[in-house]
Amino acid sequence: MDAVNACGAVAPWHVGRAALLRMLGAQPYVPVWHAMQRFTDVRDATAVDELWVVEHEPVFTLGQAGKLEHVLAPGEIPVVHVDRGGQVTYHGPGQLVVYPLLDLSRLGLGVRDYVYGIEQAVINTLAQWNILGERREHAPGVYVGDAKIAALGIRVRRGCSFHGVAFNVAMDLEPFHRIHPCGYRGLQVTSVLDLGGPSEMDTVAAALLAELARQFGFVLHPTSGWLSS
């Protein structure tokens, strides 16, 4: 298709399926995107899966199905055409972005099950703060009532995934008014903070990573260092 365990402790490598965890902090979008591409292009059947966690500088990204007509008034925020599925979305400070770089073939996962697992991890995370997250048929992501709280856009190349999920934690939502989010005119967006949840990115990241590890049977091993150029 082209278009830490739950307690936060570092477990021994032999427990569960190992995956490396990279906490990248605040980063511009394009270098991380290009690094994902390179990682996916050069990995082989023995490569360890990785999850990258990042908070992007302001950017609109337009997926392969995206139309410029859905970008209404970007202003000073750059628009980047990317190789993930889906339409247009916004990334910015206060949004938790997780990129699972997984060998889906090795995991025995189809794309539908993979998407379902990511959505379920977000739904389970929200439930920790008594927020009811839901799926919508034919509209990937997670919604609370009529508002979207997590956008999902992926690509699979040679059976391996890149791109991922963007989860609104405590962010300025105004830039979403400059686009038709995910290609839907008038789609509302919301955040964890606006719904009474925590504003701390570290708190939400720990909860979401634990749920992703549970969904996909991983034990996450934090690793230091930036990405190779």
Curated annotation (Swiss-Prot):
It is found in: Cytoplasm. The keyword Transferase applies. Residues 45-220 form the BPL/LPL catalytic domain. GO terms for cellular component: cytoplasm. Pathway: Protein modification; protein lipoylation via endogenous pathway; protein N(6)-(lipoyl)lysine from octanoyl-[acyl-carrier-protein]: step 1/2. It is an enzyme of class 2 (transferase). Keywords: Acyltransferase, Cytoplasm, Transferase. In the reaction, the free carboxyl group of octanoic acid is attached via an amide linkage to the epsilon-amino group of a specific lysine residue of lipoyl domains of lipoate-dependent enzymes. This is Octanoyltransferase. It comes from Xylella fastidiosa (strain Temecula1 / ATCC 700964). The lineage of its organism: Bacteria, Pseudomonadati, Pseudomonadota, Gammaproteobacteria, Lysobacterales.
